[in-house]
A protein has these predicted regions:
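N-terminal secretory signal peptides and thylakoid transit peptides that target proteins
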Residues: 1-14
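Histidine-rich, glycine-flanked metal-binding segment
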Residues: 24, 28-34, 41-86, 503-506
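Divalent metal-coordination and catalytic microenvironments
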Residues: 39, 59, 80, 111, ...
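C-terminal cap of metal-dependent C-N hydrolases
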Residues: 39, 326, 411-417, 422-423, ...
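Alpha-helical scaffold segments that flank or form the walls of functional sites
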Residues: 96-124, 129-159, 177-195, 218-226
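Active-site neighborhoods of metal-dependent hydrolases
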Residues: 147, 153-155, 159-179, 185-206, ...
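Divalent metal-binding pocket/active-site signature
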Residues: 191-249
Length: 514
């Protein structure tokens, strides 16, 4: 993991405006660097909070106690505020924009001090080349060196993505790996873990990761057992075959002997909302048998992915160019259309598909538009518009799909083995990190949990929520000395007003900070 700031105090939703002006004291008279006075300390353990002072020295929590006598060079009055560990985003795509804007404004402003990237089977290392300036690296050592030079505003941990590993060794073809390729991939995973990767991720709805059979996944996850690090998976299916996909993930982790983290757990499409009980039952059964199974989720009812993900996996064999070629073929094209329309119907139609980003300047007006209405305004069929968007952007088209249940979301967030994530990037309301029309989760997830699901709906307590945002994810990926407010731990600290904290980013206007 690369670290940037050992001490961050973030005021959320106006909390900074209520903080007293720091009183500066002479260094010779101060024992601590910073003392936060009189806040309500929720330490990340899940236990009830206490009113206390928090003293910080040399980048670490030095003391927590009521009315500490010794002073700090900087003293901050935080009475009426919650003082908590800096949040850990266990499923982040912040590695996509950090290189252009290392300030990570949308991350820091949510109180997130550590992001775990390399998700859904894609990581910045290992790669054979830095294609299209995407900042990919030959090894994890090279990645850490580059991040060290970049000095981003947040701590960064990364998993190694099995889709990236497969592309590195096998390419993008839909075929089994050879014995030699398996040896190479296993070595790559071993090397990544030895050089600081905090787990292994897969994206089994994306190519080339979707082409990996269970046996390949098991073999590549076995090195995790030695490190006691998790296999984090974007399941092979999150709708009609969700229960089977959960079963596959549990089986992979069982056979590999490693912990399992189910990424952004969801039941997609109204006809699948009733499957959550069976999913929870599968998780409970696995845990009773001795497996370590947990999951994460962001607090919204829509997901974000690539528009190509609406198209069947078999049609994406070989990449976007092959997909677009097959679309134009008589038999294959008709089958692709039929299966794509079935997928769209599952989530409620084209008006539940919003375009979140395109690379073609010609199609920028489509960003933020529902595809059904956008196509109607053009007098065209939505499927044909989708294909044209992909063609003109070389497949680089993002989408938001509206397909989830509020009740299920609350149950997932409140579940004892659930954690909070953004599944979003690092954005800014100005500069190079303002891109497209993204899902609001990248700017509002953690404040939204605290505002909507703790304060308003009371789906979980403040202490439970903070634990799911700090100590649980930190422990999950082996971050020692982070995720708790405790003596000797890194002074990653967030301060906020629990009565007023609020997310402001919306699907209509995502570029708004909390």
């Amino acid at each position: 993991m690369i670290t940037r700031r050992s001490f961050v105090v973030t005021g959320l939703a106006g909390a900074a405006a209520t903080l007293a002006r720091p009183s500066l004291l002479l260094a010779s008279r101060a024992r601590y660097d910073v003392v936060l006075r009189g806040g309500h300390v929720v330490d990340g353990s899940g236990r009830a909070g206490i009113d206390a002072d928090v003293a910080i020295a040399n980048g670490r929590v030095a003391m927590i106690g009521r009315s500490l006598r010794d002073s700090g060079r900087v003293e901050i009055d935080v009475r009426g505020q919650v003082v908590a560990p800096g949040f850990v985003d266990i499923h982040s795509h912040g590695d996509g924009t950090l290189w252009q804007d290392p300030r990570a404004e949308s991350v820091i402003r949510q109180g997130i001090t550590t992001i775990v990237v390399g998700q859904d089977g894609f990581s910045r290392a290992p790669a054979t080349s830095d294609e299209n300036g995407t900042r990919s690296f030959r090894s994890f050592g090279d990645l850490w060196d580059a991040l060290g030079n970049l000095r981003p505003a947040v701590n960064v941990a990364s998993m190694v993505g099995l889709g990236t590993v497969r592309s590195f060794a096998v390419g993008d073809a839909n075929r089994p790996a050879t014995a030699a390729e398996m040896r190479r991939m296993t070595q790559v995973v071993d090397d990544a873990l030895a050089n600081g990767a905090c787990g292994v991720s897969s994206g089994l709805e994306y190519t080339p990761g979707a082409f990996a059979p269970r046996e390949e996944l098991v073999a590549l996850c076995r090195p995790l057992a030695r490190h006691r690090l998790p296999y984090a998976t974007h399941l092979r299916n999150e709708d009609d075959w969700l229960v089977d996909a959960v079963g596959e993930a549990i089986a992979v982790a069982r056979d590999a002997g490693c912990p399992l983290q189910i990424s952004h757990l969801k039941t997609q499409g109204p006809r699948n909302w009733g499957k959550l009980d069976e999913v929870f039952a599968r998780v409970a059964a696995a845990r009773r048998s001795g497996q370590d199974v947990t999951f994460d989720r962001y607090p919204y009812l829509a997901y974000q992915t690539g528009l190509t993900n609406l198209f069947p996996v078999w049609s994406r064999d070989g990449g976007v160019r092959e997909l677009l070629s097959r679309v134009g073929q008589a038999d294959a094209g008709e089958r692709i259309r039929r299966e794509t329309l079935a997928k769209v119907e599952l989530i409620g139609g084209w008006d539940n598909v919003m375009i979140s980003g395109v690379s073609s300047a010609e199609d920028k007006p489509a960003e933020g538009k529902r595809l059904g209405g956008y196509a109607a305004a053009l007098g065209r069929d939505p499927y044909d518009v989708a294909v044209d968007l992909l063609r003109r952007s070389g497949g680089n088209v993002g989408m938001v799909g509206f397909a989830m249940s509020e009740r299920n979301l609350e149950r997932i967030l409140a579940h004892p083995y659930g954690m909070v994530c953004t599944d979003g990037g690092a954005f800014a309301i100005e500069g190079p990190a303002r891109r497209g029309h993204p899902h609001p989760r990248g700017l509002g997830s953690f404040p939204r949990v605290l505002a909507r699901y703790v304060r308003e709906r009371r789906a979980l307590s403040l202490e439970q929520a903070i634990r799911k945002m700090s100590s649980l994810p930190a422990a999950r990926v082996g971050l020692r000395g982070r995720g708790w407010l405790a003596r000797g731990f890194a002074a990653d600290v967030v301060v906020f007003d629990a009565a007023t904290i609020e997310d402001r980013a919306t699907f209509a206007d995502p570029f708004q900070y909390p």
